[in-house]
Amino acid sequence: PEEVWEQDADRMQDAGVSVVRMAEFAWSRLEPEEGVYEFGWLDRAVQVFTERGMDIVLCTPTCTPPQWMFHRYPEVIQVGRDGNKIPIGVRGHRCMSNLRYRDFCDKIISRMVGRYCDNPNVIGYQIDNELEANHCRCPECVSRFRKYIQGKYHTIDAVNRAYGNAVWSGEYSCFEEIEPPTAAVLQWQNPSLTLDYNRYASESTVDYVR
């Protein structure tokens, strides 16, 4: 609660804390409605620590998009390995490759950085939170995965040879036939396909961060 912020800050200072981090999961408070930004409360929180000479690391809230985004733009929801959109919980259920989601990320981050960039006590920004590989199977990710495979192997024959697809009659005739592993039992998937998908998912996250 805001009424104990100063008390907490004093105790942290007494304990020797010199740097704090904040706003990590606060997207719904920073943008309660699409395009409506409320940074007043964060201004006050930053001021509490600035007055005490403590440094601040601000965290982008991008790991936890607000509920209005999921309901208004369901295409930003991650698709799980069963081929269905994952149930909306409280965190981490967005597709990092979705362009609409990335646009919202750009907007909230630009607002945050533009507001606090001149505060000398704000010493840095944490990007997202505990980043994981983007294991999404939405149409955008399927398309990106196929392009990743094509860029790596160049020809479909090279894919078939590398994967040993002739063994299980799994030879592809074109890149459009390639799907990410979605079976409930991943042991039934071609391990080479699964490995390439995991590598793609990792690179997808790197691209998101950039």
Which residues does each predicted region cover?
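Polysaccharide-binding and catalytic clefts of secreted carbohydrate-active enzymes
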Residues: I86-R210
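Boundary/entry segment of secreted carbohydrate-active catalytic domains
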Residues: P1-V4
